[in-house]
Amino acid sequence: AVGPVADNTITDAATSPDGFSRQAVVVNGVTPGPLVAGNIGDRFQLNVIDNLTNHTMLKTTSVHWHGFFQQGTNWADGPAFINQCPISPGHSFLYDFQVPNQAGTFWYHSHLSTQYCDGLRGPFVVYDPNDPHASRYDVDNDDTVITLADWYHTAAKLGPRFPAGADATLINGKGRAPSDTSAELSVIKVTKGKRYRFRLVSLSCDPNFTFSIDGHNLTIIEVDSSNSQPLSVDSIQIFAAQRYSFVLNANQAVDNYWIRANPNFGNVGFNGGINSAILRYDGAPAVEPTTNQTTSVKPLNEVNLHPLVSTPVPGSPSSGGVDKAINMAFNFNGSNFFINGASFVPPSVPVLLQILSGAQTAQDLLPSGSVYVLPSNASIEISFPATAAAPGAPHPFHLHGHTFAVVRSAGSTVYNYSNPIFRDVVSTGTPAAGDNVTIRFLTNNPGPWFLHCHIDFHLEGGFAVVQAEDVPDVKATNPVPQAWSDLCPTYDANAPSDQ
């Protein structure tokens, strides 16, 4: 692991995680990038050095540290043209932010176009020396992080606008495509009798994965950096950008067991060891498992997740019992997604810079129709009714700068105002289920915060809005470094072929 102070050098390099070689965007030479780690209370100083040379995968970049509140450092959140101009090739930019009150499992990824699909993504863990769950596990280290990623043999800009599935699923950076079932699989080692805190991170650009380990139950203790009451399950459907910590008790016979991560579309199943990795007990032979998948009898259901420590839900316990309720009406026209009639097109001037330059109202902020101005210290409710008008469901939605209470989950018609889970990415479900996923949060963090579908191809198609929170206080609460102010003039001077 690297951090909390680290250089992250971004380059193009050939990589063959599934036996097929292609150019990718790598961090310090690898994809997924290295684990970034620190402790609660740390100041992270992450210097991103742009040495990219391949315009097909973009030469500019911008990195989002997913799940961090960035209170007072909205400029360090990362989304290109929301919070900053991209970093230009041959330049670097220091992301310098404090993590005073968050711990758990996070990740980082490019937040420029579809660049993270080409490899710029990796896990991020903030440890809590006083973790309330500490007595439940014996091991929690670099080797207990499990990343899931969809991998494509074609660069995102050269492939279809909306791919019909990945070529391979990578578990900890290794996997197999159906075309080559001899590629090496990841091996995760355990010692019989020990309890492991595994941190499952979806680095996905598109599919959700149903994750399971043959012969073992998984006890969930953390959801997107929020501690949860322990919940025992035998499979976890994890959507793009979500994270779960689960405890695995290595109490089975010494052997090899299949680890499975089945995508919801594309190359599904496990023939030839696709969508798989290996759980190997110490003392087991170095061979592939022969275990069989059993039917899941206790799959994760989001409504069964509850905060470890009682957390009040913003607003009052009734539908619309908030200071401001917003409905997000989805649409699609064959090439672009729309929310309430607007498809998000990145503005040439980042939204934060517009605010710092004096723009205050939704009418003044660009892109027109995509910026929602929220009052300070208010309870906000957002509903996302699933609709056949927005294909590619379920759409996982992510709000930057916050965790939110999921008062109505996908697959449920119940509103829970007493003990719903708080998280930062939520599945908005399917029209077939009649879903109307509803979230609540408090505006306690001034700045423009992106709210978008985390299927990166859908985001590229405009499936996003900006929540501009407490606009009058943004300038005073988010002083920007000179290096940030220099990003836009440098970027704007690039030739198109250097963007």
From Swiss-Prot:
Keyword Secreted: yes
Ranges where the Plastocyanin-like domain occurs: 2-127, 139-281, 348-470
Binding site for Cu cation 3: H111, H400, H452
Domain of life: Eukaryota
EC number: 1.10.3.2
Positions of disulphide bridges: C85-C488, C117-C205
GO CC entries: extracellular region
Binding residues for Cu cation 1: H64, H398
Enzyme class, broadest EC rank: oxidoreductase
Reaction(s) this enzyme catalyzes, per UniProt: 4 hydroquinone + O2 = 4 benzosemiquinone + 2 H2O
Protein family per UniProt: Belongs to the multicopper oxidase family.
Protein name: Laccase
Lineage of origin: Eukaryota, Fungi, Dikarya, Basidiomycota, Agaricomycotina
